[in-house]
């Protein structure tokens, strides 16, 4: 069996474009005899941690990458009809330095360069190229575009620029599809490779798992673009070649240039990124100068708080409980965590921003009660501290804190001022195609009347985590339609194939992350409607040990009393 590694692969996080589910990619790679596989989503790194974990769980080496967009001029140029064009480029992380640089580039694409797409430019590529492997990408790459338009001198110039920057880590990318343009470009890339001494690498730009998934992928593109399968001008791939092909298929396609296959293994061997899980990276909290340690300051706040909260009713039980909790907090390294949360709650209260009494297991801490993080006495209500924090707990604890919805942003702004705006970010979340939604989406793409698909969608029970397959088991009427009506059978089969894929990204309603170094040192950033958020969801940030425990919820329950109080004073 020939050795080959897929280095240009789009997962479900190339939203409404990639149809490869992350959990399936390493499984399929292993089935086909491959021991490594890459993820290179369009302009984002949403799925890299899930991908990394899935690969590791299946004994497959994960290669972390991204297909970035490159501005034709600079990332700051945003002139209509000129700068809405962009080139594609594949970047793969060789090591953890490369991952950090890739994260920085992807972040800057959103923060500085967003114009239709998140774009980088050659200036920042030069600045953050260390630890990265670069491939010339698909037909949308700058080299390929110039070759396609017979601008050979420019193609050479572009290729040499990248070669000078990346050295032996720059490759010209040939792809295994039957598009007429690709066949032409492949031939010219081979010639360019021999002329300039730049290595070739074979890829397949895999957007779906198997050949038979191509139709579902076409439907997915219709959902993305709002088109119907009957529209002649719809966006589509002209062949069904864009799947995770076997090493044999790839080797057969490139039998005349076997070095392009061999170089995939060369690249895979160069790539070794590792993530650490289960540790905590807390930002530094500055304590007053008169305190030698952060723990001394927390203990002083706690001692003072106990005197205020319990006054003459301080008992040995209370003091012992506080001493025990403080020892656990210190031992587990969460002193700064308590101080950070105390600080922004204290700020909110000082500004007259209504704060909730506290929710969840954090209410079981007498230290939290004493210093004012919560307003619930754990002694009075027999609440257990160990539910919140104990040496056996692996995951990071968190306080659920509710603020007046109308003034929540003031608290976030304060945190940004205190720790630095580049050390604070909101957190991304994803909406997925639920059972009912995907039926309506697929029905629209197939040009089935809305009334019919809506009726079908309403047959799905209104239950949490319901799937179409479960609904078919529960609803006999739906099952009969599925079995007896070819049109509905087709619709539901496609819907099952697409169900659960992420549909859109948005900002988490109440989470923010605070980091020791700038956020994009650890995770890539995303921008939507002017709001900066992480590209990783909250649970992923927790796994990476980042302080995303600032559950700054803005709830209306806290808000109306303040509004009523204001009105009653008029």
Task: Please name every model-derived segment.
Residues 552-563, 567-570:
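Residue-level detector of conserved catalytic or cofactor/ligand-binding positions
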Residues 1-551:
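Alpha-helical scaffold/interaction cores of sigma-54-like transcription cofactors
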């Amino acid at each position: 069996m020939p050795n080959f590694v897929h280095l240009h692969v789009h997962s479900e996080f190339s939203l409404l474009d990639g149809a490869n589910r992350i959990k399936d990619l390493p499984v399929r790679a292993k089935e086909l005899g491959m021991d490594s596989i890459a993820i290179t989503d369009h302009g984002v790194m949403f799925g890299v941690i899930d991908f990394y974990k899935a690969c590791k769980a299946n004994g497959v080496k994960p290669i972390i990458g991204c297909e970035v967009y490159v501005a034709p001029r600079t990332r700051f140029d945003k002139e209509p009809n000129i700068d809405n064009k962009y080139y594609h480029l594949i970047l793969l992380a060789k090591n953890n330095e490369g991952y950090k640089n890739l994260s920085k580039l992807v972040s800057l694409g959103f923060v500085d360069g967003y114009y239709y797409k998140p774009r980088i430019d050659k200036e920042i590529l030069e600045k953050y190229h260390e630890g990265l492997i670069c491939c010339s990408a698909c037909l949308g790459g700058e080299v390929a575009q110039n070759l396609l338009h017979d601008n050979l001198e420019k193609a050479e110039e572009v290729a040499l620029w990248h070669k000078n920057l990346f050295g032996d880590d720059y490759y010209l990318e040939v792809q295994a599809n039957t598009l007429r343009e690709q066949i032409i470009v492949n031939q010219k890339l081979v010639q360019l490779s021999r002329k300039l001494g730049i290595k070739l690498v074979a890829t397949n730009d895999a957007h779906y798992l198997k050949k038979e998934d191509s139709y579902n992928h076409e439907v997915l593109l219709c959902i993305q673009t709002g088109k119907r399968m009957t529209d002649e001008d719809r966006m589509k791939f002209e062949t069904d070649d864009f799947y995770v092909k076997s090493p044999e298929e790839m080797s057969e396609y490139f039998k005349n240039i076997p070095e392009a296959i061999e170089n995939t293994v060369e690249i895979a061997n160069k790539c070794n990124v590792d993530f650490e899980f289960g540790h905590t990276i807390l930002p530094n909290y500055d304590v007053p100068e008169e305190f030698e340690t952060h723990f001394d300051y927390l203990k002083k706040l706690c001692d003072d708080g106990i005197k205020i909260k319990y006054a003459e009713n301080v008992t040995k039980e209370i003091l012992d409980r506080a001493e025990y909790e403080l020892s656990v907090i210190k031992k587990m390294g969460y002193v700064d965590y308590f101080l950070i949360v105390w600080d922004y709650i204290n700020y909110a209260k000082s500004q007259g921003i209504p704060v909730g009494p506290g929710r969840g297991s954090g209410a079981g801490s007498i230290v939290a009660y004493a210093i004012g993080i919560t307003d619930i006495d754990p002694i009075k209500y027999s609440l257990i501290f160990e539910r919140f924090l104990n040496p056996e707990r692996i995951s990071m604890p968190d306080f659920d804190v509710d603020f007046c919805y109308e003034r929540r942003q003031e608290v976030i702004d304060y945190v940004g001022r205190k720790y630095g705006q580049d050390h604070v970010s909101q957190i991304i979340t994803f909406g997925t195609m639920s059972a009912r939604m995907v039926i309506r989406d697929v029905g629209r793409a197939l040009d089935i009347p809305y009334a019919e698909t809506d009726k079908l969608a309403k047959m799905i029970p209104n239950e949490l985590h319901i799937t179409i397959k479960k609904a078919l088991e529960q609803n006999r009427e739906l099952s009969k339609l599925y079995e007896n009506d070819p049109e509905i059978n087709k619709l539901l089969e496609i819907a099952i194939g697409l169900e659960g894929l992420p549909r859109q990204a948005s900002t988490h309603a109440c989470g923010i992350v605070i980091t020791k170094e700038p956020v994009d040192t650890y995770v890539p950033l995303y921008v939507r409607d002017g709001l900066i958020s992480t590209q990783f969801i909250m649970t992923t940030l927790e796994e990476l040990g980042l302080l995303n425990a600032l559950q700054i919820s803005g709830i209306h329950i806290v808000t109306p009393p303040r509004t009523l109080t204001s009105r009653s004073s008029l």
